[in-house]
C-alpha cells in the first residue's frame, strides 16, 4: 500500500504544522511529477537539471536591453568613438571619477578631514569654473532642442530632460561665483535675468559654432616682471590639440571680479588684456593690446575679453603662442595688483578661476575613419543575408497579403547609454541619448502616416506589377536631429561638440 503510506506522511506533516508554535517540520519529498511542476526537473541519477537562464537584461527608464558581451562592448565603443570623431577614448587627468577612500577608524577619519581642510585639496574637475561654464552652454543647447521637439523627446533618456542640471554637478556655497548680489557685470539672459556664467553674446556665438572648447591656465607661478610691469599677470593656454578643419569663430578670456571693500572701494579700474608678441631677457616683453574694460570697484561678476584674433594666430602658428598679460590701472594712472581690484587668480576659489573659451566651426566635411576589416566582413555577410531574404520574399504579389500582418513603417525606440559603455569618467553630459531607428513594411497602399515620397509611391506600384525586378521602398529616417556632447579631453580641457544627424525624429518610405 505505497499510496496509503505517502498520504499518511502528508497528514502527519500538516497536523504538526497546525499544532506546533515553532517552525513547521521538514516537508516530505514530493513525487517526480510534483517536483517537475515546481520548476526543477530531475535528470538521470536524480541530479537536478535547471532550464537555461535567459541572458541578463537591464532597464533604463523603461528601456529593456541585453547586456553586451566583452567583445561586443569593445566593438560598440570603437564604432561610437569613430562617429564622435575621436581617435581614442579620452583619459583626462582630472575627470568625473573620484577614487573611493579606504575605510578608516573614526579617529583617523577625523584627522584625515582636518588635513584635507588645511590642504584645500582641489575638487573634481566638474566643479571648476570652466566645466561649469561649459555645462551652462550645454544646458542652453539642450533647452533649444526641447523647444524644437518637446513632443518627440529627442536626444533624451525617457523620463529625463535633455539638459544636465548644474545643481547635480556642483554644490554652491553662499558665496559661490554664480550668486551676484551686487551690480552684475553679466549681460542679461533671454529671460531678463543674469545667467550664472554665460551671457547673451555667448549664446549668439554658440548658435554659429559646431564645437566649443575651454582651456585652463597653465601658469603655476607668477613671473618676475620689470618695475614697470611688476603688477602684470601672465596666462598661458595650450591650443595645440584643436581638431583639423576647425576654424575659430570667437574666443574669450574670462576672469571673475569680486566686490572691492578695501582702500580702492571707490575707484574705477581700467583692465587691459595684451598678447605677448616677443619675450626679452633684459627688458619688457613686446605686447599688443587686445581688449579693455572699465569697471567700478563695487561691481561683481565675470569679465569677458575678446581674444579672437590672437586665438586664430595661435591655432595656425602655435610657435607664436606666448600667452597673455593682464594689467589694472586706476583712473589716476596708478598701476595696481589685480587682486587689489578684486580680480580672482589661480589661487582663488576653483569655481571663480580664470579660463579661456573658444568657439569653432568646421571648415570641411568630417570623414569617418575606416572601419576594421572584421566589421566590414560582418556587414557584408549581413547584407548578403538581407538580399537573400528580399529575393525569397519577392516571389509574387502574394507578398502583400503576408505584409498586412506586419508592422507598418514607423519609428522605434533605441537608447544609447554612455554610462553602460564605461564612459562616465570623461563624458560629463548626457548620460545617453535616444537614437531611435526606423523599421516596418512599406506595402501598398501607402497611407499618410508612412510619410512616403512620390517616388516611393510609384516604386510601390511598379513592384506590385514586377516584384521580381523592382524591390519595395525602404523604411528610412525622414528627419534627423543633432545632439550635443560635453566631455573632457586628455588634457582635462572641456569640449562641447554638436553632432548632426544622430537622432531619428521621423520615419517614412523611400
Curated annotation (Swiss-Prot):
Gene3D superfamilies: 2.60.120.970, Cystine-knot cytokines (2.10.90.10). Disruption phenotype: Deficient mice are viable and fertile without displaying overt effects in tissues known to express BMP6, suggesting a functional redundancy among the factors of this subgroup. However, these mice show a significant increased liver iron content. Keywords: Chondrogenesis, Cleavage on pair of basic residues, Cytokine, Developmental protein, Differentiation, Disulfide bond, Glycoprotein, Growth factor, Osteogenesis, Secreted, Signal. It comes from the Eukaryota. It is found in: Secreted. Residues 390-401 have a biased composition (Polar residues). Residues 1-20 form the signal peptide. Residues 106-116 have a biased composition (Low complexity). GO terms for biological process: BMP signaling pathway; cartilage development; cellular response to iron ion; cellular response to mechanical stimulus; endochondral ossification; eye development; immune response; inflammatory response. Expressed in the lung. Low levels seen in the kidney. Belongs to the TGF-beta family. This is Bone morphogenetic protein 6. It comes from Mus musculus (Mouse). The gene is Bmp6.
Amino acid at each position: 500500500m505505497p499510496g496509503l503510506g505517502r498520504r499518511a506522511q502528508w497528514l502527519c506533516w500538516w497536523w504538526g504544522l497546525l499544532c506546533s508554535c515553532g517552525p513547521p517540520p521538514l516537508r516530505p519529498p514530493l513525487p517526480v511529477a510534483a517536483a517537475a511542476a515546481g520548476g526543477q526537473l530531475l535528470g538521470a541519477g536524480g541530479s537536478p537539471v535547471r532550464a537555461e537562464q535567459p541572458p541578463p537584461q537591464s532597464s533604463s527608464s523603461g528601456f529593456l536591453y541585453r547586456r553586451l558581451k566583452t567583445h561586443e562592448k569593445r566593438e560598440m565603443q570603437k564604432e561610437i568613438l569613430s562617429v564622435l570623431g575621436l581617435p581614442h577614448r579620452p583619459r583626462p587627468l582630472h575627470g568625473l571619477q573620484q577614487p573611493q577612500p579606504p575605510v578608516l577608524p573614526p579617529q583617523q577619519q577625523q584627522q584625515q578631514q582636518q588635513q584635507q581642510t588645511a590642504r584645500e585639496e582641489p575638487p573634481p574637475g566638474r566643479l571648476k569654473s570652466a566645466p561649469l561654464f561649459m555645462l551652462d552652454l550645454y544646458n542652453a543647447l539642450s533647452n533649444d532642442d526641447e523647444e524644437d521637439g518637446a513632443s518627440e523627446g529627442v536626444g533624451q533618456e525617457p523620463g529625463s530632460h535633455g539638459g544636465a542640471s548644474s545643481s547635480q554637478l556642483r554644490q554652491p556655497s553662499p558665496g559661490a561665483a554664480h550668486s551676484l548680489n551686487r551690480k552684475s557685470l553679466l549681460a542679461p539672459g533671454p529671460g531678463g535675468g543674469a545667467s550664472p556664467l554665460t551671457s547673451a553674446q555667448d549664446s549668439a556665438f554658440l548658435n554659429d559654432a559646431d564645437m566649443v572648447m575651454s582651456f585652463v591656465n597653465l601658469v603655476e607661478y607668477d613671473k618676475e616682471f620689470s618695475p614697470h610691469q611688476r603688477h602684470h599677470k601672465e596666462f598661458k593656454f595650450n591650443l595645440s590639440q584643436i581638431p583639423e578643419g576647425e576654424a575659430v569663430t570667437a574666443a574669450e578670456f574670462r576672469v571673475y571680479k569680486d566686490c572691492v571693500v578695501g582702500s580702492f572701494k571707490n575707484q574705477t579700474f581700467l583692465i587691459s588684456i595684451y598678447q605677448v608678441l616677443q619675450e626679452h631677457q633684459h627688458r619688457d616683453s613686446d605686447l599688443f593690446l587686445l581688449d579693455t574694460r572699465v569697471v567700478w570697484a563695487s561691481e561683481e561678476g565675470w569679465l569677458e575679453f575678446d581674444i579672437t584674433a590672437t586665438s586664430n594666430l595661435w591655432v595656425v602658428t602655435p610657435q607664436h603662442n606666448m600667452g597673455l598679460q593682464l594689467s589694472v590701472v586706476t583712473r589716476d594712472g596708478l598701476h595696481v595688483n589685480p587682486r587689489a581690484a578684486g580680480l580672482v587668480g589661480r589661487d582663488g576659489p576653483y569655481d571663480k578661476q580664470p579660463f579661456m573659451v573658444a568657439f569653432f566651426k568646421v571648415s570641411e566635411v568630417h570623414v569617418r575613419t575606416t572601419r576594421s576589416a572584421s566589421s566590414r566582413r560582418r556587414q557584408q555577410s549581413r547584407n548578403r543575408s538581407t538580399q537573400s531574404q528580399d529575393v525569397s520574399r519577392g516571389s509574387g504579389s502574394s507578398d502583400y497579403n503576408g505584409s498586412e500582418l506586419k508592422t507598418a513603417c514607423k519609428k522605434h525606440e533605441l537608447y544609447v547609454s554612455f554610462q553602460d559603455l564605461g564612459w562616465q569618467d570623461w563624458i560629463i553630459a548626457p548620460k545617453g541619448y535616444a537614437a531611435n531607428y526606423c523599421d516596418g513594411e512599406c506595402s501598398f497602399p501607402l497611407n499618410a502616416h508612412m510619410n512616403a515620397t512620390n517616388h516611393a509611391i510609384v516604386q510601390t506600384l511598379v513592384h506590385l506589377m514586377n516584384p521580381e525586378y523592382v524591390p519595395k521602398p525602404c523604411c528610412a529616417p525622414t528627419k534627423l536631429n543633432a545632439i550635443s556632447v560635453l566631455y573632457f579631453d586628455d588634457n582635462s580641457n572641456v569640449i562641447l561638440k554638436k553632432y548632426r544627424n544622430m537622432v531619428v525624429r521621423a520615419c517614412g518610405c523611400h
